[in-house]
Swiss-Prot record:
Source organism: Archaeoglobus fulgidus (strain ATCC 49558 / DSM 4304 / JCM 9628 / NBRC 100126 / VC-16)
Enzyme class: transferase
Name of this protein: Uncharacterized tRNA/rRNA methyltransferase AF_2399
Record family assignment: Belongs to the class IV-like SAM-binding methyltransferase superfamily. RNA methyltransferase TrmH family.
Alphabetized Gene3D superfamilies for the sequence: 3.40.1280.10
Single Gene Ontology BP annotation: methylation
Entries under NCBIfam families matching the protein: rRNA_methyl_3
Record-level GO cellular component terms: cytosol
Entry's Gene Ontology molecular function annotations: RNA binding; RNA methyltransferase activity
Length: 224
């Protein structure tokens, strides 16, 4: 995967994910810092006139779902599931939010989403390199498994009960749905609670990454 966003390149470099760097000799403080780090780490730097500053990084390595579950259990933490979310920028923004609030990991469906691309990496501000990300075949089955392990499970939906009216206990898992399709019915059926974020304006919903932030902040308050 080729990255052109300097912030994402720096985060990938610090995590040892950069294979090589390309540039045409342009300099600014951020690029100079990245080049210095690359030299110290022994990352090859290729200079070519007209070449946009970029970095080739190794593919995102997905974590095992069981690893994230164990991490949430032992740390009394929470997991973010993204159901029917296909826009790479939204995926990246949600991953950034999850990492910021200390989630044990993020879970994506194997179908429809595909692999994480540059748009998600950029929107995550490099958070994709700092938080475990897993992919599973069936969200409903995964949620069912978590319930048996003692997780509180939540699905976000406009027709749900108010978030503030629900008693939240950790470990927990929250499922955020795509803006077009939302959380699928089988997944909602498996969750302990179907909840919404109450608002007072004329617009009846939030961008999914904003909604994810509110849910995860609420859960993080139970832990920290």
């Amino acid at each position: 995967m080729r990255l052109t966003d300097v912030n994402s390149i720096k985060e990938a470099l610090l995590e040892g994910k950069v294979v090589r760097i390309y540039h045409s000799g342009e300099r600014n403080p951020k690029i100079s810092e990245i080049l210095e780090i690359a030299r110290k780490k022994g990352v090859p730097i290729y200079r070519k006139d007209g070449e946009r500053f970029s970095a080739e990084v190794s593919p995102i390595k997905y974590a095992d779902f069981e690893f994230i579950v164990k991490k949430a259990l032992t740390g009394g933490s929470f997991i973010l599931f993204l159901d029917n979310v296909v826009d790479q920028r939204n995926i990246g923004a949600c991953i950034r939010t999850a990492e910021f609030f200390g989630a044990a990991g993020v879970v994506l469906p194997k179908r429809r989403v595909g692999s994480i691309q540059e748009g998600a990496v950029k929107a995550s501000a490099g958070a994709v390199f700092h938080i475990p990300i897993a992919r599973v075949e069936n969200f409903a089955s995964a949620i069912k498994k978590l319930k048996k392990l003692g997780f509180t499970t939540l699905a976000a939906d406009l027709d749900g009960e108010d978030l503030e009216a629900v008693s939240l206990l950790l470990p927990a898992a929250v499922v955020i749905g795509g803006e077009d399709r939302g959380v699928s019915r089988p997944v909602k059926k498996q969750c302990d609670f179907v909840v919404k974020i109450p608002g007072v304006g004329k617009v009846n919903s939030l961008n999914l990454s904003v909604a994810a932030g509110i849910f995860l902040y609420t859960l993080s308050r139970q832990k920290y």
